[in-house]
Amino acid sequence: MSLYRKRLKIIKGEGIYVWDDQGRRYVDLIAGIGVAILGHNHPEWVEGIREQLNKLVIAGPMFNHEEKEEMLEELSKFVNFEYLYMGNSGTEAVEAALKFARLYTGRKEIIAMVNAFHGRTMGALSATWKPKYKKDFEPLVPGFKHIPFNDVEAAKEAISKETAAVIVEPIQGESGVIPAKKEFMKALRDLTEDVGALLIVDEVQTGLRTGKFLAVEHYKIEPDIVTMGKGIGNGIPVGLTLTNFDVERGKHGSTFGGNPLACKAVAITLRILRKERLIEKAKNKFIQIDADEVVTTRGKGLMIGIVFKTTIGKYVEELQNRGYLVHTAGQRVMRLLPPLIISKETMQDVKLAIEGVINDLRGGEN
């Protein structure tokens, strides 16, 4: 259950920091696995949520409310998709995307990627790759197949007029922060268009974090469906499924999706991101780790994967001892998903801390 041999009990957060029950402060480079995009207790966000709690929390999906209108207005400043479905998590956003693709095309086949991660509900889990997540829940949803990530020839062979959709992460997070190649993303777009299939881009982890609102913008292609979650609500559970086509009303739904509190959380989060230009600034906060034990540093902006030659348990532990919380993506990749409010200077401190730990532990046992 824990990354750490000694599991922390976190009791409060402020900005980029969290504190444990012993009063120790840590730089939080996990941010709830990429969720606390504005950091902890951002004053403007907290005040807006407090006001909403005192006003209206739930209304039901059959009603409109001003918080939804406010959210849509803010969202329209970043993207121009025509339709939006709101759920309560990233995996729900993916479930909706898969259902919409089958509804719209009338086809059943979904093509996903080797080493993909899209969530743990049954449809999203069927698109996810790792057997360890899936084996105890089989049989899963039929109609899914996986092709090697970044393999154009495999995509050409797999995508056909039987395909409803291809689903892909612009950067595979869970498998080690591996960016898609430009030629691969372009091929997916061209191949799906050629056969009338849809392209679903899963931005649950990459969204907001890479220097652009959507990481797919780096590839200069336009997907048919985009899924978002994690940081879009800054801690309030939200999932968004964005499309340029409509589906028949009543074919999918959510009791809590689109509630006033969630809509307000998204609206405030987007407004702060826009006013403080945090998404744009993220592209200049990427750090490169220079150490013999490191093979490479991957990712974009504030989605960073540091690939080690050996397993990284001892480095994760020692960084915690020195006041830095980091995540992992496999046994040899250290993953950083800090709040976007972190400064460039602090990211340089993080770089020095990681390099210092590597240097001090050089030659020790994992």
Swiss-Prot record:
The biological pathway it contributes to is: Amino-acid biosynthesis; L-lysine biosynthesis via AAA pathway; L-lysine from L-alpha-aminoadipate (Thermus route): step 4/5; Amino-acid biosynthesis; L-arginine biosynthesis
Chief location category? cytoplasm
Q: Origin, by domain of life?
A: Archaea
Q: Please list the cofactors this protein needs.
A: pyridoxal 5'-phosphate
Q: Which residues bind substrate?
A: 120, 254
According to the UniProt entry, its GO molecular function terms are: identical protein binding; pyridoxal phosphate binding; transaminase activity
NCBIfam families linked to this entry: argD, PRK04013.1
**Name of the protein:** Putative [LysW]-aminoadipate semialdehyde/glutamate semialdehyde transaminase
- Organism, scientific name: Pyrococcus horikoshii (strain ATCC 700860 / DSM 12428 / JCM 9974 / NBRC 100139 / OT-3)
